[in-house]
Amino acid sequence: MAGVNVGDDKLVFESSEAVTVAPTFEALNLKEDLLRGIYAYNFEKPSAIQQRAIIPIIRGRDVIAQAQSGTGKTATFSISMLQSIDTNLRETQALVLSPTRELAVQIQTVVLALGDYMNVSCHACIGGTSVGEDIRKLEAGQQVVSGTPGRVFDMIRRRNLRTKDIKMLILDESDELLNKGFKDQIYDIYRYLPPATQVVVVSATLPHDVLEMTTKFMTDPVRILVKRDELTLEGIKQFFVAVEKEDWKFDTLCDLYDTLTITQAVIFCNTRRKVDWLTEKMREANFTVSSMHGEMVQKERDAIMAEFRGGQSRVLITTDVWARGIDVQQVSLVINYDLPTSRENYLHRIGRSGRFGRKGVAINFVTVDDVRILRDIEQYYSTQIDEMPMNVAELT
């Protein structure tokens, strides 16, 4: 592995071979209309992962790209796809798979924004929406399809999503996708794709078993990985609050509300039931909160996301369905009401605050039973999680 120091970004990158570092978007030799879209999107210079991963993807190599939450991973593969697409061919040429519907829609938004001057078509193919509408859109020809595995496989099986011209498969948040839940569907989809399809795997965390699985459908991939010790985001202050028992968490949360001048905050619980319970209890105590989880119908989830994005709702209580990749600029505080069930999800959750290097605060509610889990997370990421100080309001 060739180590490349990023300088200002204070990250040590590793790659499996020498990777060209492109300091500017011009250095990537992109199509003129794509470059216009990038600048219109207010990107000035490529982020560290974009500087390294876009060129090998454009050259047709299989790539495993790992970077922190909030470093511009979505734009990395969106730019690469848009550069590779033949805009005169009204057939699906790139397929992006995501673990959640919200992430699939967000990717569609980014692709359409960056491809604004290219007359590119991109469809979000997700569960919870009209199958008839999907079929109509796909029949018309969509150059990029961004979707969730279940609905995408359904559309391929029905022959509404034609795969013969697909040349690129992107697996976003691949650790979650390749975990038990989606693994079989990914393999089913992969079998329908042309043999020469280029595969790009993108994620903040790549546990060993995921890397093993990628060997099954990637050929000599270029690996661009951040060293694990660097993975807890710089600029995010992490604290814990010791709560002797579960019942005390609610009072602690209410106390925090009074002391924190919040721009926007996300509160994570481990189950849908807990989200509903906490939302109800907060409202009874006259706090304004909104909530979202995977059991809600798609229309409701969209409306809640739009409200939160627009700033009408300031506090969102949710499950891990929200933790991966959802980009809301104003979030400065994350509270883990429940500690996450996996170390990887801890990173995805706290990566929500302070995107693109802006400051943020993460507060973990820790019962006696949770101490071991917290110490494990701390050790795994070589980070420090201190007891929350009294002046926490000044830190956000």
UniProtKB/Swiss-Prot annotation:
Motif (Q motif): 23-51
Binding site for ATP: A67, Q68, S69, G70, T71, G72, K73, T74
Domain Helicase C-terminal: 235-396
Highest taxon in the source lineage: Eukaryota
Location of the Helicase ATP-binding domain: 54-224
Motif (DEAD box): 172-175
Top-level class of the enzyme under EC nomenclature: hydrolase
Stated family: Belongs to the DEAD box helicase family. DDX48/FAL1 subfamily.
Main function: ATP-dependent RNA helicase involved in 40S ribosomal subunit biogenesis. Required for the processing and cleavage of 35S pre-rRNA at sites A0, A1, and A2, leading to mature 18S rRNA.
Record's protein name: ATP-dependent RNA helicase FAL1
Organism name: Cryptococcus neoformans var. neoformans serotype D (strain JEC21 / ATCC MYA-565) (Filobasidiella neoformans)
